[in-house]
């Protein structure tokens, strides 16, 4: 499974980001530009995933890692963001609400 750090994510601007947290978590604060597709609904929303490579984030990295493993098994080019949104916030990066 491919992974990147929040610092590497911060340096990227051209790779789509899918946030697999639940809607209430996402609306409380998320990485700017992220699209919310909760892990609990991911299987029903595969058509909403970006074409090509994309990153996947959650709060700490566990849910996104599970999502990436499942998506890779289906042929998607997904990369896990280690540390998740919690690490993003701890690094002092901006969030959207």
Question: Each PLM stretch: what is its role?
Answer:
Residues 1-16, 20-55, 60-97:
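Rhodanese-like catalytic fold shared by cysteine-dependent sulfurtransferases
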